[in-house]
């Protein structure tokens, strides 16, 4: 396996600069064999913010993740727009102090795993990007039976 480039500049692609209200995240994925990348691996983007919230309710942030393409290159990048936070309405014990924690967006898209290109994501400045790499623990194919 070859050593993957470690900077966005190594790709010589004209990815846009982040606007003054954005920050740009770049993820370099570990190289896998071609068929595995296509069939087994997926990358999940988990945008969100670190916020003070009560310790009981489940919270999430409204918003969207839009896929865009560099014209003439075919390289994709993602732009995150974040909206307000929503929460469940369970009662909180009196005196429970708020806690700082990462609150994810409701939309957490799965995108193809491709180690040949960087994953470039533009987020609002107050946002934070987490991600997960998904793969089957044990490749197993079965045929469903009739009952």
Curated annotation (Swiss-Prot):
Q: Name one Pfam family in it.
A: Ecotin
Which positions make up the signal peptide? Answer: none
Domain of life here? Answer: Eukaryota
Tell me, what is one Gene Ontology molecular-function annotation carried by this entry? Answer: serine-type endopeptidase inhibitor activity
User: Which family does the record claim for this protein?
Assistant: Belongs to the protease inhibitor I11 (ecotin) family.
Q: What is this protein called?
A: Ecotin-like protein 2
